[in-house]
Amino acid sequence: MTAPASTVIPYFRPAVERALSAAGGLELTAPAQISGVDGQRIGRRSGNALEFSEYREYRPGDDLRRIDWRVYARSEQLMIKQYSEEIDPRCDVILDHSASMAVTERKAAAAIALAVIFTTAAANSGFSLNLWHSADTFRRDPYPADPFRWDFPPFETPFSPSSVPASFAGPFFHRGIRILITDLMGPDDPSSVLSRLADGAKRAVVVMVLDPEELDPAPDSNVMLIDTETGEERELVLDEGTLRRYHERLEHHRAMWASAAATRGVLLLPLSASDYHTEIRPDELFHAGLLK
C-alpha cells in the first residue's frame, strides 16, 4: 500500500469519497470553554492562546467575572472580554500509520474515512486545522482539509503512536481539540501517548478502530498468525478455549486504556471498522458529542 507524494492512495479513493459525502454537512463540536454560551462559534481571529482579542455584548448566562467594568463605567454597556482561543478554535487530527492499521482493507479504509470526517467537520466549523501522519515520526500534512492532496505514507511503519512522542519536535495547537485515530494494538504503556496527547489540550480524544475480525474472530482449525509490525509468526488452533482467552485479553487491554484515559481526562471511543467502510454510520461520533 504505497502512494505517490501529495495524493491519497488510489486504492482508498472510494473510502475518501464516501467520507466526504457523509461529512459534507457536519461540524466538529467545540468544547464549552472555546465556544459561546449558546455553543456557537462567535467569530474568527488570529492570535496566541489566552491573548485578548475583542469584546462582545453581555448575554444572560455569561460569567459575570468576565465583564469589563471599566468599559461599563465609560459607556454604561455590559461588555464581555473574549480571547483568541474562543475566536479561533483549533484541532489536531493524528492518524496512526502503523502496519496493524491495515491488517484488513476494511480497517485501513475506515481509519482514512474517520480522518476525512474529522478534518472535514473541523474545516466546516472554521477550526484552524492540523493533520498529522504518525509514521516513523509525526508528519504535518500541508493540505489537511483536502484529502485528495494528502501526503499519505503507507500503513507499514513498525512504530506505534506511543513510540513517537519522544522524537516528535512539531507543536500541537495549544488549548485545542486533539483526536488520535489508532487501534492501540501494541504492548505500550498508555501513559506516554495519553499524557502527550492531553498536555495543553482543551479536549483529547482517542478513537480506537478495530476490525470485526479482531473484535470477534471466527473459530478455525489451524491458522498462522503474523505480527504485521514485527513479522513474528505463530501457529494456533482457534478453538473455543483459545478464543475465550483472546476475548479476555482484549477486554483487559481495552479496560487498561480506558482507565488510563479517564485518569487523564481523555475520551476513549472504541469503534468497529464495519461502520466506516462501505457505508458511513457515524452515530457513535454524535453520541460522544464530537460532531453536530
Q: What are the residue ranges of the model-derived segments?
A:
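Exposed, interaction-prone extracellular/peripheral surfaces
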Residues: 1-44, 56-65, 71, 76, ...
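Residues that recognize and position ribonucleotide moieties
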Residues: 48
